[in-house]
């Protein structure tokens, strides 16, 4: 069974800052950002990275973003800046279909079939084992998606025959501002 876990959502402050630039206007929303990095001591093995933004979205900014999203990708460039990182545990066949989305999606890493299912094999034995892996083999990946790409996936896959796509779209619905910036203007069927 497919499982998707949101790791992080970021970029709203940057997207809002860019929103009104084409017309030389200032952002109306209020943003408070924090970026700090420190290490407690020389022997401390951990670095602390604190990165965050508190955003109070002005209703007119949100309405403008929705208007641009509804007009299409060429107008909705601003939502490319809002990104989500997720752990996806899914069959290889779904992961291959997700790879259709080359822009606004990046696979940061995936479990290695060579280091896990085919551990200790080499040469012809390794090639044979990898070529015989079933497409239904479950694999864990970490992927990054822009909100613009997630909207495209929702539009293109909402009526797909594979039930895994419906689970994926259900996950998209859980994201912050998904109704406002991903699903806005779409039919209730999506």
Where are these regions (language model features)?
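Family-specific signature for flavin-dependent thymidylate synthase
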Residues: 1-190
